[in-house]
A protein has these predicted regions:
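Short aromatic-glycine motifs in intrinsically disordered, low-complexity regions
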Residues: 1-11, 72-76
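Catalytic strand-loop segment that frames the active site of acyl-thioester-processing enzymes
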Residues: 12-51
Length: 144
């Protein structure tokens, strides 16, 4: 696990980001490689497995957390949680798939951080929207 991923509070089996392509204080590009043997696929759906949208949303939130962790202004921030998600799913994701996760900071206030997010598979958008994270120990100045 890379040091940026280790800054996330998540661990297996609920850590979905397995690669950080690039990250800075405002943007993270990450990836989640779904091989097809993951336990959750056994029931979603037998004979035609699909990656659950709620897990894609969580993976996008983890990518946003990577961007927060890459910001030196939030070096002491510890963990966080997804407090709001407005994500639209454009097409289903069947394994095997490399889900590219993009999160771009749009601003924040106090502990709240707002991100535009997008997930792609083979260049096609599979999910997009906005999420808000609450980061413990974060003291975002008002940004709009």
């Amino acid at each position: 696990m890379g040091s940026r991923i280790e800054r996330l509070p998540h661990r297996a089996p609920f850590l979905f980001v397995d690669e950080v392509v690039s990250a800075d204080a405002s943007v993270a590009h990450c990836a989640w490689n779904v091989g097809g043997r993951e336990e959750f696929l056994k029931g979603h759906f037998p004979g035609r497995p699909l990656v659950p949208g709620v897990l894609i949303t969580e993976a996008l939130a983890q990518a946003a957390g990577i961007a927060v962790a890459a910001d030196p202004a939030h070096a002491n921030a510890a963990g966080g949680m997804l407090v709001h998600a407005d994500v639209r799913f454009r097409r289903p994701v069947a394994p095997p798939a490399r889900i590219e996760l993009h999160a771009s900071a749009e601003g924040g206030l106090g502990a709240l951080h707002r991100f535009a997010v997008e997930a792609r598979v083979d260049g096609a958008v599979v999910a997009e929207g906005r999420i808000v994270l609450a980061i413990q120990g974060s003291d975002n100045a008002a940004q709009e």
